[in-house]
């Protein structure tokens, strides 16, 4: 699984995961992705075959509902709760995402809330 981290998620999370061999991009690190609208960022993730990771449930859930209504598949959406994974605790978020990266059973068009690794 490949990931694209939404702009509000630290590039340090992506850096840690890349250091461990994972294919992860962060919008915060890419001037071409910073400032994109949520639908445009989701489209980029789909074109690149990436699940999108975001704190922004309110804007991205309607996008995946629209995909479902049109019977279009997507590469997944991972919602991060800001109270469980504050932005300054990027190591914990990276560890939880690494646990998720090995889960082939998720398949396509999944929506998942990020949990602590091992939980």
Predicted regions span which residues?
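Short beta->alpha connector loops at strand-helix junctions that form conserved
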Residues: 28, 56, 81
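Acidic, PIN/NYN-like endoribonuclease modules and their adjacent C-terminal/linker elements
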Residues: 1-7, 11, 15-18, 33, ...
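Acidic, metal-binding active-site segment of PIN/NYN-like and related structure-specific nucleases
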Residues: 38, 44-46, 50-63
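Short, surface-exposed loop/turn motifs that are enriched in glycine and acidic residues
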Residues: 30-34, 50
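Short, basic, glycine/proline-bearing loop/turn elements
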Residues: 21-30
